[in-house]
Amino acid sequence: MKRLVLWLLVVFCFASAEAQHFKAYRGAVPGSYNFWFHDPENGAHKDPKAHFPLLIFLHGRSLSGHNLDKVKRYGPISAVAKGLSIDSYIMAPQTSNGWAPDKVMQLVDWAIKNYSVDTTRIYVYGMSMGGYGTIDVCATYPDRIAAGMAACGGATVKNLEGLSKLPLWILHGTADRAVPFSASQKVVDAMEKTGTDRLIFTPLKGVDHGRPARLFYMTQTYDWLFSHSTKDPGREVCRDFKVTPEMLSKAYEDLRDLKSNSDKEDEYME
């Protein structure tokens, strides 16, 4: 009985800690998506002059629907709950079918209106369907997005010229059977024709579709994103970071409680 009570207490404390990090919003932005929001100060706003970056996470198809709890399966909500510190506002919306750049930007405007967002440091990242969404948002709003990271995705918008205006990191596993490697390659080929020097393309040799989701648990992912600002002279891309298949394999080692769950979590990532 004592063990049961202790176990329930641990679960309750974990759930309470997670709730303090993220708050669910449903219907807060008419015409847009429901979303989770993370306030790094937990509503305290200790320094009224402090402004934080805003990070937008776009999930893959497996998390689509009308149940916001599905968005906890992988990505920043899971990463923060398991011990990763991300010092920024985070929005994790949920879509039922694809990502519309205009709707994503409605969420950004809501965050700017309600929180002290550093408007020069707004970032978007995602994988699979979220990778498509990331590229579409970056192509549509390059002047508002400081940097983007798209894993195992592609593009649905026809005009990709905007991608040449901001730092963008595209990653894709060569063994991806869900979204072919060629989907990212087409975007890269189109960007290279513009002569852009703001693109990083990382083919992940032998990596399948689910493994790149470990990017969301790696500190260098956030270090790279947060190193950019729309105020940077020339909007240069930072090339001080890299991602390899080996680094993805070790992504969970520095985070609590992830080792035993790593293979199981990959099953949900698409």
Regions found by a protein language model. Name each.
Residues 17-54, 132, 137-140, 187-189, ...:
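A domain-start/cap signature at the N-terminus of enzymes
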Residues 52-54, 58-107:
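Active-site machinery of serine-nucleophile hydrolases
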Residues 111-114, 120-164:
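Primarily recognizes the serine-hydrolase "nucleophile elbow" in alpha/beta-hydrolase
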Residues 191-210:
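Catalytic histidine neighborhood in serine/cysteine hydrolases
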Residues 164, 169-172, 176:
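Short beta-strand/loop motif that positions the catalytic acidic residue
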Residues 61, 95-96, 174-177, 205-208:
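Acidic beta-to-alpha connecting loop that harbors the catalytic carboxylate
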Residues 69-71, 180-190:
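Short alpha-helix in the alpha/beta-hydrolase fold that links the catalytic acid
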Residues 42-50, 99-128:
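Gly/Ser-rich "nucleophile elbow"/oxyanion-hole loop immediately N-terminal to the catalytic nucleophile
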